[in-house]
Amino acid sequence: MKLSNEQYDVAKNVVTVVVPAAIALITGLGALYQFDTTAITGTIALLATFAGTVLGVSSRNYQKEQEAQNNEVE
């Protein structure tokens, strides 16, 4: 599956900005309302780590593809 530049940028923003903010929010609310947030924040963090890894592989493959195309042009 290929992502457009816009899709990649949105996914990267979600993984690097939105998810950490959501984890902080959930953790803070858990402290205020005295409920355990370990399972949910751990799950979200694991999913974000997986998504970040997939995005990293996607980015690396894109870079290799671009380099190959640039070498063909030269």
Swiss-Prot record:
Cross-referenced InterPro entries: Phage_holin_Dp1
Q: What does this protein do?
A: Accumulates harmlessly in the cytoplasmic membrane until it reaches a critical concentration that triggers the formation of micron-scale pores (holes) causing host cell membrane disruption and endolysin escape into the periplasmic space. Determines the precise timing of host cell lysis. Participates with the endolysin protein in the sequential events which lead to the programmed host cell lysis releasing the mature viral particles from the host cell.
Self-association state and partner proteins as the record states: Homomultimer.
Q: From which source organism is this entry?
A: Pneumococcus phage Dp-1
Keywords attached to this Swiss-Prot or TrEMBL record, sorted alphabetically, are: Cytolysis, Host cell inner membrane, Host cell lysis by virus, Host cell membrane, Host membrane, Membrane, Transmembrane, Transmembrane helix, Viral release from host cell
Localization, per the record, is: Host cell inner membrane
Gene Ontology cellular component terms for the protein in this record = host cell plasma membrane; membrane
Q: Where are the transmembrane segments?
A: 15-35, 37-57
Write down the membrane topology.
Answer: Multi-pass membrane protein
Protein name per its UniProtKB record: Holin
